[in-house]
Amino acid sequence: MILEHVLVLSSFLFSIGIYGLITSRNMIRALMSLELMLNGVNLNFVTFSDFFDSRQLKGDIFSIFVIAIAAAEAAIGPAILSSIYRNKKSIRINQSNLLNK
């Protein structure tokens, strides 16, 4: 596979994630956009690791580390959102000021 194609794909994923994170008013949509951004970054790590130095697995190992952190975020994020919804009755970003009671 050509390096430019993979870089365009990963930048497209990252750009969709940034756009979704900036324009979303819903916290669940923001978490999904964050996952898209992390997947774009992981695709870059794996591509550069394979393309430039295929014997050393530094990019692959770092990508696995980022996937583990994304899995923890995907497990803890909805729990935090359900707690916020129980207290505030809304999961909209602009309505949930967590510093006020």
UniProtKB/Swiss-Prot annotation:
NDH shuttles electrons from NAD(P)H:plastoquinone, via FMN and iron-sulfur (Fe-S) centers, to quinones in the photosynthetic chain and possibly in a chloroplast respiratory chain. The immediate electron acceptor for the enzyme in this species is believed to be plastoquinone. Couples the redox reaction to proton translocation, and thus conserves the redox energy in a proton gradient. GO terms for molecular function: oxidoreductase activity, acting on NAD(P)H, quinone or similar compound as acceptor; quinone binding. NDH is composed of at least 16 different subunits, 5 of which are encoded in the nucleus. It is found in: Plastid, Chloroplast thylakoid membrane. The chain crosses the membrane at residues 2-22, 61-81. The gene is ndhE. It is a multi-pass membrane protein. It is an enzyme of class 7 (translocase). Its EC number is 7.1.1.-. It catalyses: a plastoquinone + NADH + (n+1) H(+)(in) = a plastoquinol + NAD(+) + n H(+)(out); a plastoquinone + NADPH + (n+1) H(+)(in) = a plastoquinol + NADP(+) + n H(+)(out). It comes from the Eukaryota. Signal peptide: none annotated. GO terms for biological process: ATP synthesis coupled electron transport; photosynthesis, light reaction. PANTHER family: NADH-UBIQUINONE OXIDOREDUCTASE CHAIN 4L, NADH-UBIQUINONE OXIDOREDUCTASE SUBUNIT ND4L. Belongs to the complex I subunit 4L family. GO terms for cellular component: chloroplast thylakoid membrane; NADH dehydrogenase complex. The keyword Cytoplasm does not apply. It holds the Pfam family Oxidored_q2. This is NAD(P)H-quinone oxidoreductase subunit 4L, chloroplastic. The lineage of its organism: Eukaryota, Viridiplantae, Streptophyta, Embryophyta, Tracheophyta. Keywords: Chloroplast, Membrane, NAD, NADP, Plastid, Plastoquinone, Quinone, Thylakoid, Translocase, Transmembrane, Transmembrane helix, Transport.
